[in-house]
Curated annotation (Swiss-Prot):
Sections of the chain in a coiled coil: none
Subunit architecture: Homodimer. Polymerizes to form a dynamic ring structure in a strictly GTP-dependent manner. Interacts directly with several other division proteins.
Record protein name field: Cell division protein FtsZ
Record function comment: Essential cell division protein that forms a contractile ring structure (Z ring) at the future cell division site. The regulation of the ring assembly controls the timing and the location of cell division. One of the functions of the FtsZ ring is to recruit other cell division proteins to the septum to produce a new cell wall between the dividing cells. Binds GTP and shows GTPase activity.
Similarity comment text for this entry: Belongs to the FtsZ family.
InterPro entries found in the cross-reference section: Cell_div_FtsZ, Cell_div_FtsZ_CS, FtsZ/CetZ, FtsZ_C, Tub_FtsZ_C, Tubulin/FtsZ-like_C, Tubulin/FtsZ_2-layer-sand-dom, Tubulin/FtsZ_GTPase_sf
Organism, as annotated: Coxiella burnetii (strain RSA 493 / Nine Mile phase I)
Subcellular location: Cytoplasm
Cellular component, GO annotation: cell division site; cytoplasm
Organism placement in taxonomy: Bacteria, Pseudomonadati, Pseudomonadota, Gammaproteobacteria, Legionellales
Swiss-Prot/TrEMBL keywords: Cell cycle, Cell division, Cytoplasm, GTP-binding, Nucleotide-binding, Septation
Length: 386
């Protein structure tokens, strides 16, 4: 049962730290979107990259080791550079309640330094969420192995970990999309999560959500996913919720028995109790019966017909609660020649899910065919069409 109440002003300190080249690019994208209530930090071994950053705080890693020339794709150099700057990292993190770490895995600085940032954050008791990318397959096995090792090391310290495989950019968006728009789509995953959580904590809303609720959902939960969906019109609540849950750019994860769910609904003054219920029902479909579910709303007078849903799901792959899991059904998103059918994709998700299927696809087959059956959110389709 959900309780309605007033949200008092919050003073939780949220930082987003971009580590290395990939992480730096991600926070530049977020800075351009003018997110309130968040402080950005750019950390790198490359002094030239830091000189181009618009972050309020920049941190040069490994002055003595790299001389400002980068880590040379060597994670051990990135790790040593971060160790050299450990005291400065601690100084930057002190007083922070929640930190997002973002980096590209497989290179030198992000792979080697990110676990050091996470370790220091854990020592300080900071709620830590990492959002990282994995290399394209064509970059080779060695780089992928380096990325996997970095992700494993990061997982030892963070509370929640989200991975975005770059290869999904090819599968979901198609090979003809511009490189700029492809990486913009990946950066939007982090943008949506940070904006959704920051809005819940820092902006007044109708549902009483505070930082303690966020910590409960995300603390020591391991594998996680996050997504954002926006829709308008009669079925906007259901469509936005399902688009947020789809998250085709994220690493393949098993939703069954999710132990924590954080939802932010942002809409105008016309948000109805029925729409609130529709979002809740979409969440109920995959969460464990014993999961901690926190749903908050933010009223934005500037939003007229649009409704935005941000979903953060944690504790994935755990079957302890006996949740029903996500009902995986084949969704026909392609034409007979294998190309994307954009007319079909423009139909609401729930209508496509209700169409009869000629065969049943089990979980493993579904994962192998994620391109054919992927539910692609509207903002990604628009990028492809532009």
């Amino acid at each position: 049962m959900f309780e309605l109440g007033e949200t008092s002003p919050q003073n939780a300190q949220i930082k987003v730290i971009g580590i290395g080249g990939g992480g730096g690019n991600a926070i530049e994208h977020m800075i351009a979107e003018n997110i309130d209530g968040v402080e950005f930090v750019c950390a790198n071994t490359d002094s030239q990259a830091l000189g181009r950053s618009n972050a309020r705080v920049v941190l040069q890693l490994g002055d003595e080791i790299t001389k400002g020339l980068g880590a040379g794709a060597d994670p051990s150099v990135g790790r040593q550079a971060a160790e050299e700057a450990r005291d400065r990292i601690r100084e930057i993190l002190e007083g922070t309640d929640m930190v997002f770490l973002t980096a590209g895995m497989g290179g030198g600085t992000g792979t080697g330094a990110a676990p050091i940032f996470a370790e220091v954050a854990k020592e300080l008791g900071i709620l830590t969420v990492a959002v990282v990318t994995k290399p394209f397959v064509f970059e080779g096995k060695k780089r992928m192995d380096v990325a996997e090792e970095g992700i494993k090391a990061l997982g030892n310290y963070v509370d929640s970990l989200i991975t975005i495989p770059n290869n999904k950019l090819l599968n979901v968006l198609g090979k003809n999309i511009t490189l700029l728009n492809a990486f913009k789509a990946a950066n939007n995953v982090l943008l949506g999560a940070v904006q959704g959580i920051a809005d819940l904590i820092t902006r007044p809303g109708l549902i009483n959500v505070d930082f303690a609720d966020v910590r409960t959902v995300m603390s020591e939960m391991g594998m996680a996913m996050m997504g954002t969906g926006v829709s308008s019109g009669e079925n906007r609540a259901r469509e936005a919720a399902e688009a947020a849950i789809a998250s085709p750019l994220l690493e393949d994860v098993d939703f069954t028995g999710a132990r924590g769910v954080l939802v932010n609904i942002t809409a105008g003054m016309d948000l109805s109790i029925g729409e609130f219920e529709q979002v809740g029902e979409a969440v109920k479909a995959f969460a464990s019966e014993t999961a901690t579910v926190v749903i908050g709303t933010v009223i934005d007078p500037d939003m007229s017909d649009e409704l935005r849903v941000t979903v953060v799901v944690t504790g994935l792959g755990s079957h302890a609660g006996g949740g029903a899991g996500v009902p995986l059904k084949p969704v026909k998103n392609t034409k007979n020649d294998g190309t994307l059918d954009y007319h079909q994709l423009d139909r609401p998700t729930y209508m496509r899910n209700q169409e009869p299927s000629k065969r049943t696809v089990d979980l493993e087959e579904q994962r192998d065919r994620d391109f054919e059956y992927l539910d692609i959110p509207a903002f990604l389709r628009r990028l492809e069409e532009d």
